[in-house]
Amino acid sequence: MDVTALGSGQPRRIALVAHDNKKADLLEWAAFNVETLMRHRLVATGTTGRLLHDRLELAVERVESGPHGGDLQIGAQIVQGEIDLLVFFWDPLEPQPHDPDVRALLRITVLRDVPTACNRSTADYLISSPLFALRAAA
C-alpha cells in the first residue's frame, strides 16, 4: 500500500469478488457500506459486478467472471498498482474449478501489500480504518 498518498483526497480503487455461495454476503456488506463505496472506483468480477450494479446501483467496472479469468485480470491490475483494496468473499468449503487462479490472486495481494478482506469482519475493519478515511477524504 502506498502510504505516501494518504490524505491525498484520491478515491481508492476497490476490487470486489465473491464466490457463488458468498455473493449474498458481499451484497449485504456492500449495501451496508453503499455510501462509502459510491465515493470510490469499483472493479468486480462478472456476476458480482452485475449484481452490485443492478441491486445497489453502484458504478462498477466489470472484468470476466472468476472461472473465465476475472481473478487473473484483477491480479494483473494489482501488479500494475491499480487496486488499493481487495474484498474477496471466497468459499473455503466449496472447491472451485479455478482454485489456482484464486491462490494466485491471494498470493499477489500479499506480495504487493494490498489490504485484503476475505470475510465481513475484516472488510468492516478495513473500510472503517482511519487510514482508509484519510486517503479517501475529499
Residues of each region from the PLM?
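Glycine-rich, flexible N-terminal cofactor/catalytic loop recognition
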Residues: 24-42
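Short internal beta-strands
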Residues: 39-48, 52
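Short hydrophobic/aromatic-enriched beta-strand-loop microsegments
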Residues: 41, 58-69
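General beta-strand structural signal in soluble alpha/beta enzymes
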Residues: 43-45, 62-64, 88, 116-120
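Mid-chain, well-packed structural core segment of small domains
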Residues: 68-108
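Short, glycine-/small-residue-rich phosphate/pyrophosphate-handling segment
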Residues: 117-138
